[in-house]
Design a protein with these regions (language model features):
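Short, small-residue-biased leader/transition segments that mark boundaries at the very start
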Residues: 3-4
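Short beta-strand elements at the ligand-binding edges of bilobed clamshell
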Residues: 33-58, 67-72, 155-168
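An alpha-beta-alpha
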Residues: 51-94, 98, 186-207
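Hinge/cleft segment of the Venus flytrap/periplasmic-binding protein
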Residues: 178-240
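Flexible loop/hinge segments that line or gate small-molecule binding clefts
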Residues: 18-43, 147-157
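Structural motif
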Residues: 102-118
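Flexible loop/turn connectors
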Residues: 148, 153-196, 200
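Pocket-lining segment of extracytoplasmic ligand-binding domains
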Residues: 113-162
Length: 240
């Protein structure tokens, strides 16, 4: 499957980096950097994911949120857990249905999973994969976006999205290459909100002013270093 292909690609990239120690390498990876020249990055947007969870937790009337993911790997798991923690902050009674479709792109399968969750009572969907928001539109429920902004394609459905800005990571790496300071490092922190690597977008017309204000207050605390979002890379599961 795709995960094994990716692992094979990474092994090859690490071997090439070892063969060319004077060339800078930067790769998206859940694993560690290797001196002197192999650096890694990842989509550490758990902070805006937490904030989007606050939006969802306040929005659900059934207290059941559906979550459809691709693969249960660290960079997906941590965003889901952060989202769940944010939802629980504003709604301690909220429960979750979680499913992974074991594919990066299979909209029909994601849509089918989302429909099953809605049939079980979920009235807000976490759209980690394409297809979930389409299901939400058909059933008239709200959705939360992830990584990229697709709200323009689903007006009135996507309440908020946790957005990844990879440019912050790339810019830092390129600047270090340019000034000769590049070395093996983990560039994960440059996906944090404080570095401009992650952000939250909200459609405030789809939520109460109280919810929007609470989310903005928490966001300010994150940016000021007064609130830290927990990181949990373990596979999330449905509530019993």
């Amino acid at each position: 499957g795709d995960v094994y292909k990716r692992q094979g690609l990474e092994r090859a990239a690490r071997k090439v980096a070892k063969d060319y120690p004077d060339t800078a390498f930067l790769m998206g990876s859940s694993f560690t950097p290797v001196a002197p020249n192999f650096s890694v990055f990842d989509n550490w947007i758990h902070e805006p994911s937490y904030l989007s969870g606050m939006v969802a937790g306040a929005a659900t009337s059934s207290n059941l949120i559906g979550m459809v993911g691709g693969y249960a790997i660290p960079e997906v798991n941590r965003l889901m857990h952060a989202f769940m923690d944010g939802a629980r902050e504003v709604n301690p009674d909220v429960k979750f249905l979680v499913n992974f479709i074991d594919s990066w792109y299979d909209p029909p399968k994601a849509k089918e999973s989302a429909f099953a969750m809605m049939d079980a009572g979920a009235d807000v969907m976490y759209a980690e994969r394409f297809g979930v928001s389409d299901a939400a539109v058909e059933r008239g429920v709200k959705a939360i976006g992830n990584v990229i902004d697709t709200s323009g394609d689903y007006p009135g459905t996507i309440m908020a999205s946790a957005i990844w800005h990879m440019e912050a990571t790339i810019d830092k790496a390129v600047s270090r290459v340019a000034d000769g300071s590049f070395e093996a490092a983990d560039y994960g922190q440059y996906s944090f909100m404080a570095y401009g690597g992650g952000s939250l977008i909200m459609d405030e017309s789809l939520m109460s002013s109280e919810t929007a204000a609470a989310v903005k207050a928490r966001e300010a605390e994150i940016l000021d270093g007064l609130f830290r979002v927990n990181v949990n890379d373990a596979r999330p599961t449905s509530d019993n």
